[in-house]
Amino acid sequence: MLEIVAAIFIVLLGSGICSCAEAALFSVPLVKVRQLSQSNNPSAIALQAIRHRMNRPIGTIVVLNNIFNIVGSITIGALATKHLQDAWMGVFSGILTLLIIVFGEIIPKTLGERYATNIALLIAIPVRFLTLIFTPLVWLIEQITNPFTHGKRVPSTNEAEIKFLATLGYKEGVIEGDEEQMIQRVFQLNDLMAVDLMTPRVIITYLLGELTLAECQQDIIQSQHTRILIVDEYIDEVLGIALKQDLLTALIQGEGYKTIAELARPAQFVPEGMRADKLLKQFQEKREHLMVVIDEYGGVAGVITLEDVVEVLTGEIVDETDKNIDLQEIARKKRQALLKQRGVAP
């Protein structure tokens, strides 16, 4: 009878370890594995190697688990036949099945999931060693299963999961509310385009390049913008962009006879379909704060500032000189009114 108890114990122990190891390896976050591997801990490095190619280590664990369950059940059945009467064999088989399910599967997998990181680090090196031993058998299984499992690799995470984790982290107190909002807004950068963020042409402040500083003095002083668009005869004929500070400095120095165009700097142009994340990179590379947005026909659709793009991340930025909190919204309303006057449905 002692032989049966010992055999059952060995089967449950082996099956439990395999189930626990499998659950731990699947449950430990990939980001956590990469973070741990940076410490040059041998177990962490082994764990990263396992997660990089999971099919063989998991195949090894599954093979071992089945060896314990199948061979163990056969051995236990043979021993039970010697010591138990036929009438008790059905009851014994039911009890053995229940023990394997509870102590060989459910409890070990629950523990493996709950303490995934610690268990995964503990078993990483032994699993790699066992994988080498069982390589021929696992390779054979791979060749049989490849036609059914071959396909595009599924990404380890996606945008929706990261957003959800940010929200979950905020609710659990791991990150602050403003940090959660910032993470959520980052993903808007590749969803929004220049046309969504720009100040449309109907509300753009601009000056004619042919006029002198003296002629535009009042307009320059009253302008609320630090950068002013300079055009030729029409708004689509952009000559450049002038800094209000440069214009005022020239006026103070008695250079009112100069034309606005003389003080204009070259303008940078971007298509209205450019994504916000690309725009941000453009602003960084060009070291500009204002760019002209052009439509598909090459006409001026509006202007966009670095602040417009940054506000996607931070929310509305309003300083002491701002008279209108949302120029884009005002511009949209004006554009709809103009279209209505012309009999065109907005």
Curated annotation (Swiss-Prot):
Cross-referenced SUPFAM superfamilies: CBS-domain pair
Keyword ATP-binding found: no
Entry-linked InterPro entries: CBS_dom, CBS_dom_sf, CNNM, Ion_transp-like_CBS
Transmembrane regions listed in the UniProt entry: 1-21, 58-78, 87-107, 121-141
Main subcellular localisation: membrane
Subcellular location: Cell membrane
One GO CC term on file: plasma membrane
Membrane protein topology class: Multi-pass membrane protein
Boundaries of every CNNM transmembrane domain copy: 1-179
UniProt domain CBS: residue ranges: 198-259, 263-320
Pfam family, one: CBS
UniProt KW keywords: CBS domain, Cell membrane, Membrane, Repeat, Transmembrane, Transmembrane helix
Family assignment from sequence similarity: Belongs to the UPF0053 family.
PANTHER family, sorted: HEMOLYSIN-RELATED (PTHR22777), UPF0053 PROTEIN SLL1254 (PTHR22777:SF4)
Protein name as annotated: UPF0053 protein sll1254
